[in-house]
Protein backbone atom coordinates (compact mmCIF):
# COMPACT_ATOMS: atom_id res chain seq x y z
CA UNK A 1 0.00 0.00 0.00
CA UNK A 2 2.84 2.41 0.83
CA UNK A 3 4.42 1.69 -2.54
CA UNK A 4 1.14 2.41 -4.34
CA UNK A 5 0.72 5.71 -2.47
CA UNK A 6 4.30 6.67 -3.33
CA UNK A 7 3.62 5.97 -7.01
CA UNK A 8 0.28 7.82 -7.00
CA UNK A 9 1.87 10.90 -5.44
CA UNK A 10 4.34 11.29 -8.33
CA UNK A 11 3.28 12.50 -11.77
CA UNK A 12 5.66 10.04 -13.44
CA UNK A 13 4.26 7.24 -11.31
CA UNK A 14 0.68 8.12 -12.25
CA UNK A 15 1.64 8.34 -15.91
CA UNK A 16 3.21 4.88 -15.79
CA UNK A 17 0.16 3.45 -14.02
CA UNK A 18 -2.07 4.89 -16.72
CA UNK A 19 0.31 3.66 -19.42
CA UNK A 20 0.35 0.13 -17.97
CA UNK A 21 -3.46 0.16 -17.94
CA UNK A 22 -3.59 1.46 -21.51
CA UNK A 23 -1.29 -1.26 -22.88
CA UNK A 24 -2.96 -3.96 -20.79
CA UNK A 25 -6.26 -2.99 -22.44
CA UNK A 26 -4.56 -3.08 -25.83
CA UNK A 27 -3.17 -6.57 -25.18
CA UNK A 28 -6.47 -7.91 -23.84
CA UNK A 29 -8.32 -6.41 -26.78
CA UNK A 30 -6.00 -8.19 -29.19
CA UNK A 31 -6.48 -11.51 -27.38
CA UNK A 32 -10.29 -11.21 -27.23
CA UNK A 33 -11.27 -9.54 -30.50
CA UNK A 34 -11.15 -12.83 -32.44
CA UNK A 35 -13.72 -14.41 -30.10
CA UNK A 36 -17.30 -14.07 -31.34
CA UNK A 37 -18.91 -13.67 -27.90
CA UNK A 38 -16.53 -10.96 -26.61
CA UNK A 39 -17.62 -7.95 -28.70
CA UNK A 40 -19.02 -6.08 -25.68
CA UNK A 41 -15.87 -6.68 -23.62
CA UNK A 42 -13.64 -5.57 -26.50
CA UNK A 43 -15.69 -2.39 -26.90
CA UNK A 44 -15.39 -1.59 -23.18
CA UNK A 45 -11.64 -2.21 -23.29
CA UNK A 46 -11.30 0.10 -26.28
CA UNK A 47 -13.24 2.86 -24.49
CA UNK A 48 -11.13 2.43 -21.36
CA UNK A 49 -7.95 2.51 -23.43
CA UNK A 50 -9.07 5.76 -25.09
CA UNK A 51 -10.01 7.34 -21.75
CA UNK A 52 -6.71 6.38 -20.15
CA UNK A 53 -4.76 7.66 -23.17
CA UNK A 54 -6.58 11.00 -22.92
CA UNK A 55 -5.90 11.18 -19.18
CA UNK A 56 -2.20 10.57 -19.74
CA UNK A 57 -1.96 13.74 -21.83
CA UNK A 58 -2.46 15.88 -18.73
CA UNK A 59 0.44 14.17 -16.94
CA UNK A 60 2.68 14.57 -19.99
CA UNK A 61 2.28 18.32 -20.40
CA UNK A 62 5.10 18.92 -17.92
CA UNK A 63 7.36 16.31 -19.46
CA UNK A 64 8.98 18.88 -21.78
CA UNK A 65 10.51 20.61 -18.76
CA UNK A 66 11.48 17.28 -17.21
CA UNK A 67 13.25 16.29 -20.45
CA UNK A 68 15.07 19.65 -20.56
CA UNK A 69 16.23 19.09 -16.97
CA UNK A 70 17.39 15.57 -17.88
CA UNK A 71 19.36 17.03 -20.81
CA UNK A 72 21.12 19.49 -18.50
CA UNK A 73 22.01 16.66 -16.12
CA UNK A 74 23.29 14.39 -18.89
CA UNK A 75 25.69 17.11 -20.11
CA UNK A 76 27.43 16.84 -16.74
CA UNK A 77 28.09 13.08 -17.00
CA UNK A 78 31.79 12.29 -16.51
CA UNK A 79 32.09 9.52 -19.12
CA UNK A 80 32.14 10.83 -22.70
CA UNK A 81 30.12 8.03 -24.36
CA UNK A 82 27.15 8.12 -21.95
CA UNK A 83 27.27 11.93 -21.95
CA UNK A 84 27.01 12.07 -25.74
CA UNK A 85 24.32 9.37 -26.00
CA UNK A 86 22.19 10.70 -23.15
CA UNK A 87 22.43 14.34 -24.26
CA UNK A 88 21.38 13.54 -27.83
CA UNK A 89 18.71 11.14 -26.57
CA UNK A 90 17.20 13.71 -24.22
CA UNK A 91 17.26 16.42 -26.90
CA UNK A 92 15.22 14.10 -29.11
CA UNK A 93 12.91 13.45 -26.17
CA UNK A 94 12.37 17.21 -25.78
CA UNK A 95 11.35 17.46 -29.45
CA UNK A 96 9.11 14.39 -29.07
CA UNK A 97 7.24 15.91 -26.14
CA UNK A 98 6.87 19.22 -27.99
CA UNK A 99 5.30 17.33 -30.91
CA UNK A 100 3.11 15.40 -28.49
CA UNK A 101 1.94 18.65 -26.86
CA UNK A 102 1.07 20.13 -30.27
CA UNK A 103 -0.94 17.00 -31.09
CA UNK A 104 -2.74 17.27 -27.75
CA UNK A 105 -3.56 20.94 -28.42
CA UNK A 106 -4.91 19.92 -31.83
CA UNK A 107 -7.06 17.16 -30.31
CA UNK A 108 -8.75 19.52 -27.83
CA UNK A 109 -9.26 22.29 -30.41
CA UNK A 110 -6.70 24.78 -29.08
CA UNK A 111 -4.90 25.04 -32.42
CA UNK A 112 -5.96 24.87 -36.04
CA UNK A 113 -4.08 24.28 -39.26
CA UNK A 114 -1.94 21.53 -37.73
CA UNK A 115 -1.18 18.60 -40.02
CA UNK A 116 -1.85 15.74 -37.62
CA UNK A 117 -0.18 13.04 -39.73
CA UNK A 118 2.99 15.10 -40.18
CA UNK A 119 3.31 15.87 -36.46
CA UNK A 120 2.65 12.24 -35.60
CA UNK A 121 5.49 11.17 -37.90
CA UNK A 122 7.80 13.74 -36.35
CA UNK A 123 6.87 12.58 -32.85
CA UNK A 124 7.41 8.90 -33.74
CA UNK A 125 10.74 9.67 -35.43
CA UNK A 126 12.19 11.60 -32.49
CA UNK A 127 10.84 9.03 -30.02
CA UNK A 128 12.63 6.37 -32.07
CA UNK A 129 15.90 8.35 -32.03
CA UNK A 130 15.59 8.83 -28.27
CA UNK A 131 15.13 5.11 -27.65
CA UNK A 132 17.81 4.08 -30.15
CA UNK A 133 20.39 6.34 -28.49
CA UNK A 134 19.29 5.08 -25.07
CA UNK A 135 19.87 1.50 -26.23
CA UNK A 136 23.33 2.47 -27.53
CA UNK A 137 24.10 3.80 -24.07
CA UNK A 138 22.79 0.56 -22.54
CA UNK A 139 24.99 -1.47 -24.88
CA UNK A 140 28.02 0.59 -23.86
CA UNK A 141 27.27 -0.01 -20.18
CA UNK A 142 26.74 -3.75 -20.81
CA UNK A 143 30.13 -4.02 -22.54
CA UNK A 144 31.79 -2.26 -19.59
CA UNK A 145 30.11 -4.64 -17.15
CA UNK A 146 31.09 -7.68 -19.24
CA UNK A 147 34.69 -6.50 -19.27
CA UNK A 148 34.64 -6.14 -15.49
CA UNK A 149 33.13 -9.61 -15.04
CA UNK A 150 35.76 -11.09 -17.38
CA UNK A 151 38.57 -9.45 -15.41
CA UNK A 152 37.14 -10.69 -12.11
CA UNK A 153 36.88 -14.21 -13.52
CA UNK A 154 40.48 -14.09 -14.79
CA UNK A 155 41.68 -13.06 -11.33
CA UNK A 156 39.81 -15.95 -9.70
CA UNK A 157 41.19 -18.46 -12.19
CA UNK A 158 44.69 -17.10 -11.71
CA UNK A 159 44.49 -17.47 -7.94
CA UNK A 160 42.90 -20.92 -8.18
CA UNK A 161 45.13 -23.98 -8.14
CA UNK A 162 42.93 -25.85 -10.61
CA UNK A 163 43.50 -24.84 -14.25
CA UNK A 164 40.40 -23.91 -16.28
CA UNK A 165 38.79 -26.86 -18.04
CA UNK A 166 39.07 -26.98 -21.83
CA UNK A 167 37.54 -29.37 -24.30
CA UNK A 168 38.43 -29.49 -27.99
CA UNK A 169 35.03 -31.03 -28.73
CA UNK A 170 33.29 -27.89 -27.48
CA UNK A 171 35.64 -25.44 -29.18
CA UNK A 172 33.06 -24.29 -31.74
CA UNK A 173 30.43 -23.34 -29.16
CA UNK A 174 32.74 -22.30 -26.34
CA UNK A 175 32.88 -18.65 -27.43
CA UNK A 176 29.08 -18.39 -27.57
CA UNK A 177 28.63 -20.03 -24.18
CA UNK A 178 31.27 -17.76 -22.68
CA UNK A 179 29.63 -14.66 -24.20
CA UNK A 180 26.14 -15.59 -22.98
CA UNK A 181 27.49 -16.40 -19.51
CA UNK A 182 29.30 -13.07 -19.35
CA UNK A 183 26.13 -11.27 -20.48
CA UNK A 184 23.99 -13.07 -17.90
CA UNK A 185 26.42 -12.40 -15.04
CA UNK A 186 26.83 -8.75 -16.06
CA UNK A 187 23.09 -8.06 -16.07
CA UNK A 188 22.56 -10.11 -12.91
CA UNK A 189 25.02 -8.00 -10.95
CA UNK A 190 23.56 -4.72 -12.33
CA UNK A 191 19.71 -4.81 -12.07
CA UNK A 192 19.25 -1.12 -13.04
CA UNK A 193 21.02 -1.79 -16.34
CA UNK A 194 18.85 -4.85 -16.97
CA UNK A 195 15.64 -2.91 -16.28
CA UNK A 196 16.67 0.03 -18.45
CA UNK A 197 17.63 -2.25 -21.35
CA UNK A 198 14.37 -4.22 -21.15
CA UNK A 199 12.33 -1.01 -20.91
CA UNK A 200 13.99 0.65 -23.90
CA UNK A 201 13.87 -2.51 -26.02
CA UNK A 202 10.15 -2.97 -25.37
CA UNK A 203 9.43 0.72 -25.96
CA UNK A 204 11.21 0.88 -29.31
CA UNK A 205 8.68 -1.57 -30.76
CA UNK A 206 6.12 1.27 -30.74
CA UNK A 207 7.93 3.78 -33.02
CA UNK A 208 9.26 0.93 -35.17
CA UNK A 209 5.64 -0.01 -35.84
CA UNK A 210 4.48 3.59 -36.32
CA UNK A 211 7.27 4.38 -38.79
CA UNK A 212 6.78 1.14 -40.69
CA UNK A 213 10.36 0.01 -40.03
CA UNK A 214 9.19 -3.18 -38.33
CA UNK A 215 5.46 -3.83 -38.38
CA UNK A 216 4.00 -5.46 -35.28
CA UNK A 217 0.48 -6.45 -34.37
CA UNK A 218 -1.56 -4.91 -31.57
CA UNK A 219 -0.67 -7.75 -29.20
CA UNK A 220 3.10 -7.31 -29.54
CA UNK A 221 2.87 -3.54 -29.07
CA UNK A 222 0.55 -3.97 -26.08
CA UNK A 223 2.77 -6.59 -24.43
CA UNK A 224 5.91 -4.53 -25.00
CA UNK A 225 4.28 -1.40 -23.62
CA UNK A 226 2.98 -3.27 -20.58
CA UNK A 227 6.40 -4.76 -19.76
CA UNK A 228 8.06 -1.38 -20.24
CA UNK A 229 5.48 0.34 -18.01
CA UNK A 230 5.95 -2.22 -15.23
CA UNK A 231 9.73 -1.81 -15.46
CA UNK A 232 9.27 1.95 -15.22
CA UNK A 233 7.00 1.56 -12.19
CA UNK A 234 9.72 -0.44 -10.44
CA UNK A 235 12.13 2.48 -10.82
CA UNK A 236 9.53 4.80 -9.25
CA UNK A 237 8.82 2.49 -6.31
CA UNK A 238 12.52 1.63 -5.87
CA UNK A 239 14.62 4.64 -7.02
CA UNK A 240 17.82 2.64 -6.54
CA UNK A 241 16.81 0.59 -9.60
CA UNK A 242 17.02 3.63 -11.88
CA UNK A 243 20.14 3.59 -14.06
CA UNK A 244 22.41 6.47 -13.12
CA UNK A 245 24.73 8.33 -15.48
CA UNK A 246 28.45 7.84 -14.93
Swiss-Prot record:
Membrane topology field: Multi-pass membrane protein
Subcellular location, record wording: Peroxisome membrane
Region (Required for homodimerization, interaction with PEX11G, and peroxisomal localization): 218-238
A Pfam family matched in the record: PEX11
Main location as per UniProt: membrane
Residue ranges of the TM segments: 94-114, 218-238
Segments in the Lumenal topological domain: 115-217
Keyword list, A-Z: Membrane, Peroxisome, Peroxisome biogenesis, Transmembrane, Transmembrane helix
Top-rank taxon, per record: Eukaryota
Record's GO cellular component terms: peroxisomal membrane; peroxisome; protein-containing complex
Subunit structure: Homodimer. Heterodimer with PEX11G. Probably interacts with COPB2 and COPA. Interacts with PEX19. Interacts with FIS1.
Entry's family note: Belongs to the peroxin-11 family.
Protein's name in the database: Peroxisomal membrane protein 11A
Gene: Pex11a
